Amino acid sequence: MIRHGEKVLVDIAFSIRSSLALVGMSGSGKSLTLKAMLNMLPSTMHKMMDVTSDFELIRGENVALIPQNPFTSLNPMSRIKHQFFVQQEEAESLMEMVGLEREMLERFPAELSGGQLQRVVIAIALSHKPRLLMLDEPTTALDSRTKENILSLLKEIREKLGFYMLFVSHDIASVESLCEEIVVLKDGKVVEAGALNEVIENPKESYTKALIESNFKNREWRK
């Protein structure tokens, strides 16, 4: 068990075999789970963990995180070079991979749209050459069209580079095309898990069913 204020995680265990969606409604424990995996919780909380049996803590150069709230300082090129000490040519290549034109490389974040800024964040994550890419609600603040573009970009890049993926979201519709497996959280507990398509088509728990219905309401493309 891991406790953080009023929030508690209980007996959470899962494997990331390829691409996994970690979903649940607000307050379900998604972000707390992610922080626990990344060893980002306050040091006082480590005493509440049974050594590392609750989570195999993920550290080091194998992991990159795309946070919910992107950075606000340094222009794109400087940010990539500053954070991971990559060469100019590599930084330009990364920006090209995420679909940003060269003229945008020297702009500051305040001059970029939400979609452009998220592409920069993706480039920064890729500069780390991760084996596992973790995403924390990366499309929450984007409009529907930009959101679809970012999700398509992530799918294309993952198919090209072949990294593992953990996608944290409250929106199952966002992860449907990206992830093969799903873990559903409620009040810090796993209530359902399995192949994503199977869970969407045949949810066993009423909580999962309600989450799916709220996500796919009025979506004509889901039949």
Residue ranges and their predicted role:
Residues 200-223:
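C-terminal boundary and immediately downstream tail of ABC-type ATPase nucleotide-binding domains
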